[in-house]
């Protein structure tokens, strides 16, 4: 690399990744094949439009690449339609929402503080700025989605769109129940599986593809691909919607909302990386990987419970869980800082009905996808939980330094993908 300053920074990041235990639920480690595609000469090509309908010449090769990504995405998810151009999950959500409803319409999404996402109706997001947003949450007793309460809220506010999905919810979501509620109030249903896509495509979680009108996802997290977004549709893909006062098929409306509605030229190098990741996820080994992710995550959660900690909702069905730090009398922000000092990386997280500000929070979010990509098994994951608890309980700087040395030695024995 000619730029020595940047090369040194990248090498520093590579060292950080090697020597840290990565537990951020939205992060993962991509394969060499994905990195090669994303770092390829495809970054040179501008390709506004869609395959065979570009606004630039010389696109016959990237047409084949995008078509490959589309066909693999459709096969992987069992979808009738796929748009692989969204630059991120948030942009996928924006395009999907705009294809279904118009500004000022009502949306009903999961409360951010209960595990939802900014793009599901938060006032600081386009979804709360451009639309009349309402929210549902979890039961105070079980900390699990109360579908009867979702139905009650939907009947009261009569939304045009219901969004099912979450960013810090550890239980499987029943998409069919959401569709029943949406149909009762004549609303569209958008399912956001950004966090659980890997579990959906391997059959560990139920699929929303033929249940929802549209499904969105990121391509990283549990899919283990490059950072990016994806929009999918099943049997509803050819339904007619009113888009800009014209009758259009749903897939046509989505295409228009991605380009030119919210984006210009697609990132062809990233789309190539998506194609690689979809191909990897179609292999039998990927199902084994996801099975291990679930096993490792459950093992960590169960160990925390055995040590007296409270896990939000009592456990996990997926790749993440939330730990209530009340037993220690510290905040999520405190925990995040202490753990980073011993090379354990995770994030502070508010818990349902939290009395603390999100910048402080009462909990932490722990994800098992990235450590599983490095080859950690169930026993290794329990050892990770032990490191966390030791670091959070100690008051000694000497002990923290000792734990850091142990963490570096432990995690460095596992290869990066």
UniProtKB/Swiss-Prot annotation:
The modification N6-(pyridoxal phosphate)lysine is found at residue 221. Coiled coil: none annotated. One of its GO terms (biological process) is tetrahydrofolate interconversion. Keywords: Amino-acid biosynthesis, Cytoplasm, One-carbon metabolism, Pyridoxal phosphate, Transferase. CDD domains: SHMT. It catalyses: (6R)-5,10-methylene-5,6,7,8-tetrahydrofolate + glycine + H2O = (6S)-5,6,7,8-tetrahydrofolate + L-serine. Its cofactor is pyridoxal 5'-phosphate. Its EC number is 2.1.2.1. It is an enzyme of class 2 (transferase). The keyword Transferase applies. GO terms for cellular component: cytosol. Pathway: One-carbon metabolism; tetrahydrofolate interconversion; Amino-acid biosynthesis; glycine biosynthesis; glycine from L-serine: step 1/1. The keyword Cytoplasm applies. The record marks 220 as: Plays an important role in substrate specificity. GO terms for molecular function: glycine hydroxymethyltransferase activity; pyridoxal phosphate binding. Catalyzes the reversible interconversion of serine and glycine with tetrahydrofolate (THF) serving as the one-carbon carrier. This reaction serves as the major source of one-carbon groups required for the biosynthesis of purines, thymidylate, methionine, and other important biomolecules. Also exhibits THF-independent aldolase activity toward beta-hydroxyamino acids, producing glycine and aldehydes, via a retro-aldol mechanism. Belongs to the SHMT family. Homodimer. PANTHER family: SERINE HYDROXYMETHYLTRANSFERASE (PTHR11680), SERINE HYDROXYMETHYLTRANSFERASE 1 (PTHR11680:SF35). This is Serine hydroxymethyltransferase.
């Amino acid at each position: 690399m000619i730029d020595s300053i940047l090369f040194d920074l990248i090498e520093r990041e590579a060292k950080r990744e090697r020597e840290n235990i990565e537990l951020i639920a939205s992060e993962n480690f991509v394969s060499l094949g994905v990195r090669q595609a994303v770092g390829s000469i495809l970054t040179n090509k501008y390709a506004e439009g869609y395959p065979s309908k570009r606004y630039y010449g010389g696109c016959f090769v990237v047409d084949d690449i995008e078509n490959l990504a589309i066909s693999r995405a459709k096969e992987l998810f069992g979808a009738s339609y796929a748009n692989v151009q969204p630059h991120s999950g948030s942009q996928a959500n924006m395009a999907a929402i705009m294809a279904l409803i118009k500004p000022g319409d009502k949306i009903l999404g999961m409360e951010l503080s209960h595990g939802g996402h900014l793009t599901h109706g938060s006032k600081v997001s386009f979804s709360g700025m451009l639309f009349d947003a309402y929210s549902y949450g979890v039961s105070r007793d079980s900390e699990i989605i109360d579908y009867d309460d979702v139905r009650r809220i939907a009947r009261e506010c009569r939304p045009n769109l219901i969004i099912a999905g979450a960013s810090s919810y550890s239980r499987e979501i029943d998409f069919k129940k959401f569709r029943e509620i949406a149909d009762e109030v004549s609303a569209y249903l958008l399912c956001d599986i950004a966090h659980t896509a890997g579990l959906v495509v391997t059959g560990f979680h139920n699929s929303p593809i033929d249940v929802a009108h549209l499904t969105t996802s990121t391509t990283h997290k549990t899919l283990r691909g490059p950072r990016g977004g994806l929009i999918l549709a099943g049997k509803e893909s050819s339904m007619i919607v009113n888009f800009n006062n014209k009758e259009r098929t749903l897939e046509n409306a989505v295409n228009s909302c991605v380009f030119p509605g919210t984006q210009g030229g697609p990132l062809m190098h990233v789309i190539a990386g998506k194609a690689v990741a979809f191909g990897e996820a179609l292999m039998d080994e990927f199902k084994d990987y996801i099975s291990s992710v679930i096993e490792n995550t459950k093992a960590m959660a169960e160990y925390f419970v055995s040590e007296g900690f409270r896990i939000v909702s009592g456990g996990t069905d997926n790749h993440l869980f939330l730990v209530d730090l009340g037993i220690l009398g510290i905040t999520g922000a405190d925990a995040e800082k202490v753990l980073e000092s011993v090379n354990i990386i995770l994030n502070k997280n508010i818990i349902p009905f939290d009395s603390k500000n999100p910048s402080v929070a009462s909990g932490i979010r722990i994800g098992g996808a990235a450590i599983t990509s490095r080859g950690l098994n169930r026993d290794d994951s329990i050892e990770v939980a032990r490191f966390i608890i030791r670091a959070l309980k100690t008051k000694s700087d000497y002990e923290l330094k000792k734990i850091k040395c142990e963490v570096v030695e432990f995690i460095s024995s596992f290869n990066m993908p």
